Structure formats: structure tokens, C-alpha cells
Amino acid sequence: MAQVIITINYREYPISCDNGQEIQIMKLGRLLDEKAKSLTSALGHINENQLLAMVGLLLADELSELKKTVSSAP
């Protein structure tokens, strides 16, 4: 089992993952960090739990829209 540190909005989180998954976890962490920083730029300071919930909602919305697009494609 491997461990990587991801940073989201200047806070570090240790994440355990399968060996070989480290690069993917770091990429996903950077995506979360970008979303979090974008939200804090737009909204100002919000508490960490709220921020992470909002990031999750944004990503869930993007995924939902992609699924709609894929399911309606010929």
C-alpha cells in the first residue's frame, strides 16, 4: 500500500492507495485543489467542511451532465 500527500486549499491530506496509483491520486488531488481555490476566489473564506462539500457538489454536477451527454449521444 502506498501513501501520497495531496494538498487542497493549502491543507495537506495523507491518502493511502494501491501501489501504482500514486500519480492518478495526485492528479485528482490537483483537480480538487483547483476547484477549491476557484470557489474561495469567488466566495471568499468559507469553512473547510463547507468548501469540500461544495467541491464535491460541483464535481457531481459535472459528472451528471457528462452522463446526460453520453446517454443522449447517437
Question: What is the meaning of each model-derived region?
Answer:
Residues 3-5, 74:
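N-terminal intrinsically disordered, cationic/polar leader segments
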Residues 11-31:
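An acidic intrinsically disordered interaction segment
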Residues 14-16, 37, 66-67:
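Short small-residue beta-strand/loop micro-motif enriched in glycine and branched aliphatics
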Residues 45, 49-52, 56-74:
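Long, hydrophobic or amphipathic alpha-helical segments
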Residues 5, 12-14, 42-50:
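Amphipathic, hydrophobic secondary-structure cores in small proteins
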Residues 29-42:
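Short amphipathic alpha-helical segments and their helix-coil junctions
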